[in-house]
């Protein structure tokens, strides 16, 4: 995640196609400025939040790619329902990304049925002894599923 315009330029020079902005750590002005800077350089800006109180700020920033972090970064607990509770409050033209707490194909299918456009998976893949197989399981390309 980035907090300064200089980092956006560095990311682009390093070949990045997208950046992550976390609403909880950026004020309104900086959130909009960083998003606009990234987009002016041809990069996508994934604007993430956890606290529902930040959703209006995220949308007001002009974000078209919005991530709901299912992990409470204060307590480090995950709750997949966070995305599902907020889905109807996010306009359909906004690309919705569900982040964290996605453990298996059933979770992916629940999110798909709810209209989530994309997922961000980290811990499940990093804990797997075979990351390729774990990705296949999440995508439903194998008969098995990713275990918890």
Map each language-model feature to its residues.
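Catalytic beta/alpha-barrel core
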Residues: 1-5, 17-28, 41-55, 67-77, ...
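Catalytic cores of alpha/beta
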Residues: 3-14, 50-62, 98, 102-121, ...
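Glycine-rich phosphate-binding active-site loops on the catalytic face of alpha/beta enzymes
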Residues: 8-30, 67-76, 114-135
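Charged helix-capping and loop-helix junction motifs
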Residues: 32, 79-85
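Catalytic alpha/beta core domains of metabolic enzymes, predominantly
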Residues: 83-97, 104, 122
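C-terminal helical cap(s) of enzyme catalytic domains, especially alpha/beta-barrels
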Residues: 85-89, 112, 127-148
């Amino acid at each position: 995640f980035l907090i300064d315009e200089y980092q956006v330029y560095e990311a682009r020079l390093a070949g990045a196609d997208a950046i992550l902005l976390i609403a909880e750590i950026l004020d309104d002005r900086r959130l909009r400025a960083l998003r606009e800077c990234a987009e002016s350089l041809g990069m996508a800006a994934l604007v993430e939040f956890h606290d529902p109180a930040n959703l209006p700020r995220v949308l007001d920033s002009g974000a078209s790619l919005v991530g709901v972090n299912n992990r409470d970064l204060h307590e480090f607990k995950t709750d997949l329902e966070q995305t599902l509770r907020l889905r109807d409050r996010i306009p359909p033209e906004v690309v919705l990304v569900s982040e964290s707490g996605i453990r298996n194909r059933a979770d992916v299918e629940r999110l798909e049925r709810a209209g989530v456009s994309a997922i961000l998976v980290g811990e499940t893949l990093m804990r797997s002894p075979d990351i390729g197989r774990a990705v296949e399981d999440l995508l439903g390309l194998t008969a098995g599923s990713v275990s918890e």
